[in-house]
């Protein structure tokens, strides 16, 4: 498990979290 793999996993996790929060925020705005 190299540093590069750790960086890729970390970046992927941040991207997924950002997209998920953006979708939830958009759904909340549409629901109200």
From Swiss-Prot:
It is found in: Archaeal flagellum. GO terms for biological process: archaeal or bacterial-type flagellum-dependent cell motility. Glycosylated. The keyword Glycoprotein applies. Transmembrane segments: none annotated. Keywords: Archaeal flagellum, Glycoprotein. InterPro entries: Flagellin/pilin_N_arc (IPR013373), Flagellin_arc (IPR002774). GO terms for molecular function: structural molecule activity. One of its GO terms (cellular component) is archaeal-type flagellum. Its main location: other. Belongs to the archaeal flagellin family. There are 2 or 3 different flagellins in M.hungatei. Flagellin is the subunit protein which polymerizes to form the filaments of archaeal flagella. This is 24 kDa flagellin. The lineage of its organism: Archaea, Methanobacteriati, Methanobacteriota, Stenosarchaea group, Methanomicrobia.
